[in-house]
């Protein structure tokens, strides 16, 4: 085992991990937020243009530009969460989620889609924040200063709503980049292994990121794994090393999410047997309670602040 059987080291590792995460956050998170905020400002500006400064929120606009819906939700008083808009419009959550990814559901009939969009537009128009959009009730053109202020407020709301994912995604990219750098320095090659091929046929000395791994027998499904590594000298069972990159900015969130990896390792072992393992790559606020739970579920981990433990993991 790597760290799961060494509880005497856990407290020191937790403290070191928290320090590393906090330093990264202070150094990098503001830039990640600023970069995303600029993209958000651009999205809001486009939404203003498409809706004639929020005076024409129509199904046609949403059909042509589904992703605009996220900006419109932040233009109401109060700003509306996804589920709240679904409830108020008696709509479809899957439709809303698909639209905010920039797409429309291909299998939904046209008349059904039109009905849903019309209801959404009615709710958004009724709840439009008139303290921001002074020009809406009067029918007068928006003054440049009023328009700029409204766009800034909506952009701040939208960016604030996605602040946590911004930071989490930036941290995940950084963690995978560290793993890649470590592997390349040891002669590994980055090469995708198709989910349609048996997992134990992965080429030795290769690795891939965000790879789908098949689980289940009667009803096979793909589950995503952050990093899959086949050592230069594979294990006798030929199964690669599976790694999940995990980061957390507070202790509360990790305790809420700790069952996710336990479920994943159980799915993997049902499919591939007890030989397969899932290693966590941890940075941030993972306390001894989280570690004890993970160890009891058959999980092991490598700390980012001691990345060379990947060797002990088999890489």
Swiss-Prot record:
Q: Transmembrane region positions?
A: none
Protein name as annotated:
Type II restriction enzyme SalI
Reactions the enzyme catalyzes: Endonucleolytic cleavage of DNA to give specific double-stranded fragments with terminal 5'-phosphates
Q: Which InterPro entries does the protein's record reference? A: Restrct_endonuc_II_XamI
From the Swiss-Prot or TrEMBL record, what is one GO molecular function term?
Answer: type II site-specific deoxyribonuclease activity
EC no. given is 3.1.21.4
Query: Its domain of life?
Result: Bacteria
Question: Per the UniProt entry, what is one GO biological process?
Answer: DNA restriction-modification system
What are the protein's UniProt keywords?
Endonuclease, Hydrolase, Nuclease, Restriction system
Which EC class, in a word?
hydrolase
Look up and give the organism this protein is from: Streptomyces albus G
């Amino acid at each position: 085992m790597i760290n799961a059987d060494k509880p005497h080291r856990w407290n020191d590792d937790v403290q070191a991990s928290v320090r590393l995460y906090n330093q990264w956050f202070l150094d990098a998170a503001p830039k990640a937020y600023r970069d995303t905020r600029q993209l958000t400002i651009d999205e809001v500006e486009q939404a203003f243009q498409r809706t004639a400064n929020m005076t024409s929120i129509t199904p046609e606009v949403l059909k042509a530009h589904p992703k605009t819906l996220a900006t419109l939700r932040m233009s109401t008083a109060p700003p509306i969460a996804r589920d709240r808009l679904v409830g108020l419009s008696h709509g479809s959550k899957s439709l809303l989620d698909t639209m905010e990814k920039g797409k429309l559901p291909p299998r939904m009939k046209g008349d059904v889609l039109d009905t849903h969009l019309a209801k959404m537009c009615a709710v958004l128009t009724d709840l439009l924040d008139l303290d921001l959009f002074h020009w809406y009730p009067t029918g007068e053109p928006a003054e440049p200063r009023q328009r700029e202020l409204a766009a800034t407020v909506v952009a701040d709301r939208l960016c604030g709503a996605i602040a946590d994912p911004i930071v989490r995604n930036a941290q995940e990219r950084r963690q995978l980049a560290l793993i890649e750098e470590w592997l390349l320095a040891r002669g590994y090659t980055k090469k995708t292994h198709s989910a349609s091929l048996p997992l134990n046929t992965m080429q030795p000395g290769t690795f891939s990121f965000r790879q789908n791994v098949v689980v289940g027998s009667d009803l096979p499904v793909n589950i995503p794994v952050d990093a899959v590594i086949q050592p230069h000298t594979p294990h006798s069972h030929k199964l690669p090393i599976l790694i999940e990159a995990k980061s957390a900015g507070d202790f509360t969130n990790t305790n809420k999410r700790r069952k996710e990896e336990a479920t994943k390792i159980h799915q993997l072992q049902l499919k591939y047997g007890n030989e397969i393992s899932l290693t966590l790559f941890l940075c941030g606020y993972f306390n001894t309670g989280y570690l004890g739970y993970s160890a009891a579920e058959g999980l092991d981990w490598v700390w980012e602040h001691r990345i060379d433990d990947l060797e002990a993991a088999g890489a």
